[in-house]
Amino acid sequence: MKKTIILLSTLALAACGQNEAPDSYMSNARESFQNVWEHYRVPEYGLFSEYYPNTFKPDLNYFDDGTHQAQESSFLWPMSGVFSSTVLMAKADPGTYRPYLDSMVVAMEEYYDTTRVPFAYQAYPSRFDRFDRVDRYYDDNGLVGIDYIDTYAVTKNPAHLEKAKQIFTYILSGWDDRFGGGVPWVEGKRDQKPACSNGKAMVLSLKLHEATGDEYYLEIGKRFYRWIRRTLLDPNTGIIMNAWLTDG
């Protein structure tokens, strides 16, 4: 009987833990989200800093053309991370976080470049004019496109769907038949075709198919999938390689 009571007590505690876990995860998410918006947001621009405190401006090494020092606001890659988290929070609790999502949509347009066709998101906001030329990365645009199609799933605003489609058009403009297809990392440079650019393009394409039912996006998604498996999959390990180096 004693063993039975202990067993039942253990099961009851386990059940309580299972019930509390989602609330615990959401509580942690709310706290982390609030910390980012309180400490990283740059109110005068409606953007976010690369680091906290914003006075810390080290060299950043995730660029194709070498290092760049952190600036007044973050580059596009970290900014997309904030966008992604905001979409998920708005999906979980629209009443609380939908205004944050609306704010993010406005902020992302600071990175939108209409001086080059197709239009796309560049690595740093155009308002600051800190660089002679700001690169546009296919993988970053893939992230932003995924953010927009996920935003559309929350808002049902057709403008967000159109934005995702437009970004996909830009990414697809980088596809060429060298080495059987694929897109590079950076616009205008053909030295590599990485998993990050092509994998995100595949995800965006399949999400567009899911949202629209258009078979075109399914076929393009399959094309990216086949290229990744044919070109980047290591048959000995089953692992996708980082990139196909084209040396051109």
Give the label of every model feature segment:
Residues 23, 27-52, 157, 166, ...:
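Extended ligand-binding clefts on enzyme/binding-domain cores
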Residues 70-84, 135-146, 192-203:
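Aromatic- and histidine-enriched alpha-helix N-cap/loop-to-helix transition segments
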